[in-house]
Amino acid sequence: MQSNRRSGKSAGSRMVSCFTRLALLAALAASGASLARADEYRLGVMDKLRVRVAEWQTAEGAVRDWSAVSGDYTVGPSGSLSLPFVGDLPASGKTTSEVAEEIGVKMQKLFGLRDRPSASVEMAQYRPVYLSGEVQTPGEYPYAPNLTVLKAVSLGGGLRRADNGQRFARDYINASGESAVQVAERSRLLIRRARLLAEIGKRDTIPMPEELKNVPDAEKLLDSETALMESRDKRQKRQLDALADLRSLLQSEIEALAKKAETQARQLELATEDRDKVDSLAEKGLALSQRKLSLEQRVADVQASLLDIDTASLKAKQDASKAAQDETNLRNDWDAQLAQELQNTEAELDTLTLKLGTSRDLMTEALLQSADAAQLEEQAAEITYSIIRDKDGKPTEIAADENTPVLPGDVIKVNTALAMR
């Protein structure tokens, strides 16, 4: 009797534990999908990484979270990461995927694990870029993906102002740089809005916004948002599948308990009939009291077993109901998140439109007030850019223009004849 009660409770506990483990593995898988786009980036000194490690233990059917290893780590001057247990791990020149793979392999060998731990490595902070030369504020600046020379110069306040005679020309250059950054950001926001509307409308593809049909590189932005939408869709499906599997397990348990209850009910019926017959014989003095007591005990045991089955069945039904509610909540939360993201994107677009209008007004004013600024197109050849980049451990200077991509650790040199007048 006690054994059956414990088994009922244990089954319910295992179902809840199963759902928790599945949710954790889904989170790690989603994190791994988000890293796929950063795999081509090669790590370097001063890059900061966020490491998370978990291990699926096949024998126990559970997930172990290696919190002692998880955390933020910086690639040191030697080009290595220093992790607990693992020690120094070469990282410079490798991708995040390669580092994650090595962490899993080393931990498996170090601890003699049967299952290889799953490591998730993502960029927490890129190493900075540096501005030098004729920049308003030279120095160190944080790197951001898709950074170009023009955007980097804008971070440094644009070209240096030399005197009042060049003020309007400088205003034009600064406003032009800010406008270029704002136009690029507007394109990203328009594509993001199109992706959110597609997700809300349950569409499989993202239509190109009308405003961007003739914009260069719009297809790249669309491909990036499409990859993100597919990743998010897969994550939601994994979570829903986990809940569906849990409900299926609980339903199977409920059906098994129902069959067991039918069997026990039949046993109770037979035991009751035997007890009644013995009672009748005992009244006539034809049956032993010991046999009567034995049958009474049998009836009581079967009744207790039926009670345990009913309790376990009720618990399984409650868990199934909770899993169904969790599925509904997941869908509702997903829809609410999409609506909130769309609202935030619309607000950012409105703010950016105002900023873009201000930048264009400043450019117009500079052109009207200054002949230097009005002739800036002809004078643009006097502004030169170059990038000093480490190649094979040696600094190499390469020619650049405003649209040249910048990599983490680059030094951007700006030279302009206009600033020397």
From Swiss-Prot:
Cited InterPro entries: Poly_export, Poly_export_N, Soluble_ligand-bd
GO CC terms in record: periplasmic space
Secretion signal span: 1-31
Keywords: Exopolysaccharide synthesis, Periplasm, Plasmid, Signal
Cellular localisation: Periplasm
Gene Ontology biological process terms in this record: polysaccharide biosynthetic process
Pathway where this protein functions: Glycan metabolism; exopolysaccharide biosynthesis
Chief place where the protein resides: periplasm
UniProt keyword annotation of Signal present: yes
GO molecular function list: polysaccharide transmembrane transporter activity
Cited PANTHER family: POLYSACCHARIDE EXPORT PROTEIN GFCE-RELATED (PTHR33619:SF3)
Role, per record: Involved in succinoglycan (EPS I) synthesis. Needed for the addition of the first sugar (galactose) to the isoprenoid carrier.
Protein name (database record): Exopolysaccharide production protein ExoF
